[in-house]
Amino acid sequence: MRFCAIVIAALAACNHSASDATSDGARSGDGGGSGSAGSCLGSTVLDALGTSHLVVGVSGSSTAETSAPFDLRYVYLSGGLFTSTTPCTACGASCSSSWWGCYNTPPGAYATLFMTGAGSASPKQTPMFTYYEILQTAQATISGFQEGTAEVTQAATDSGIMTRYYNDWRFLLQTIGQSRALLHIEPDFWGYVRQAGDPTTLAAVVGAVNPDCTAMPSTIAGMGQCMIAMVRKYAPNALVGLQASAWNIAGNTDASTDVTQDATQVATLLAACGQSKADFVVVETSDRDAGYYQLVEDRDTWWDPTDMTLPSYAQDLTWIKALTEALGTPAMFWQTPLGNAAQTNVANHYKDNRVDYFFGGSASQVESGAAVTVSDHWSALAAAHVLGVAFGAGAGDQTDPDTDGGNLATKTQAYESSGGTQLCQ
């Protein structure tokens, strides 16, 4: 369900400076609440990022990362873990070539170089790591392992997998150290937790293999609590959040659906898993361009940019507003598709309307239909307690910042030049 941009991201990291990454200031504190930027939800997080306006992020090549004054850049850490119990001390035949820690040498340099590259950008960018390791580690360890609830009921109960998993998480956090970074823990996993049952009763290996979390319950809830607590211990200036999957709402066309109730249920689950002590919660609109889904998979995933019919952006923002207010943490859009009306609906050039809905512009309504001009919706995002939007391709053949005709870069430059939209209005 996820695209792991291992090769592309690794090459980008190799182009970054090798100087040490630095930190700026203190961690925002639990819950992402109010700060000097105002009394609105999320202002403390933006304070920590050095801004008061909604941020724009990107994932892509080193060229894309510097094509506009982006506020943050993100990258996946994925592909599976080292085969030994603890992180490799040297990269070679004895260490899995798919482990992120050996995309550069010595082990861990990949993350350091990524942070350094973000810090040396002009203007300076905040690095964001999407930690997505359970699925591919389980696939490499358990014969026939399939994505889904087995990640919860099988992988998270496997002592061997979880020993390596926590050791790798600790290694990443120690690599970040005092630096400022955003940490996004396991997209999709928490959605599968919801499908599997109650996280406070679903078993997971926690303290039995992790000395940092001996006081945590041996449940999925304890696993999430443990990972966030480890951030506070080893990377105190990092900001962290789980992901909220709006799978019941993303394609909803029934106006009678209680969107707020669904969001509240997700919030309750995530809070039990430690989100109540996190800084932000991650949300997404889709993992692929709508044009791709329509042409290649014969699926209609278009959202109405006029918000007149369902599914719509307004419906999603209603869900996010209820989610953030129930959690007490702001949201961050992540991995937002880059397709636009000028694309030709072939590989790497699929249409979508996400960029143009958020920034304003000529937005595609369907794959073959005429585009409609819409105004920007940054104020609507602020009203839903959204910190900003990070754009990036969700698969190798999707529209990305290098193939979108410069649409994202041009709109980001105009947005940043205008001073952006204040979160606290």
Short names for language-model regions:
Residues F82-N237:
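Substrate-binding cleft of extracellular glycoside hydrolase catalytic domains
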Residues A37-G92, V389:
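Boundary/entry segment of secreted carbohydrate-active catalytic domains
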Residues T63-P69, T112-K124, Q174-Q178, R232-A235, ...:
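Acidic (Asp/Glu)-rich catalytic clusters
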Residues A68-L81, D262-T306:
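Aromatic- and acid-rich polysaccharide-binding/catalytic face
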Residues H184-E186, D212-T260, V283, L327-A341:
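Aromatic-lined carbohydrate-recognition surfaces of secreted/lumenal glycan-active proteins
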Residues L54-V55, S59-S61, T126-P127, F280-Y292, ...:
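Substrate-binding cleft of secreted/luminal carbohydrate-active enzymes
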